Amino acid sequence: HTLSLHDALPIYFTKGFWGTNGISVTKGFSTPEVKEAMVKKHSMENCKKCYILADSSKFDQMSSVKFADFDQATVLTTGLLKPALKKYKNIVEVK
């Protein structure tokens, strides 16, 4: 059973983890699928602490549908970050 937007309506989360296709400091987190973006957006709005799991190749990329602002989540990432990204407190490099 796949979680739909309707299924997600009454659910509240203490912590949540999401993937993303694109991360932009100015434009936020994005994905190419409208339904996926709607579920992610709604579930993030109902979550106390949001985490985005993404490798470093997702930074400075933008897919067609935005689901959250950059400051709405802590990004957990692997790989080397560009020096300009190291100043953001919501980006954590996992080794």
Annotate the PLM regions:
Residues 4-95:
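Conserved phosphate- and dinucleotide-binding cores of soluble alpha/beta proteins
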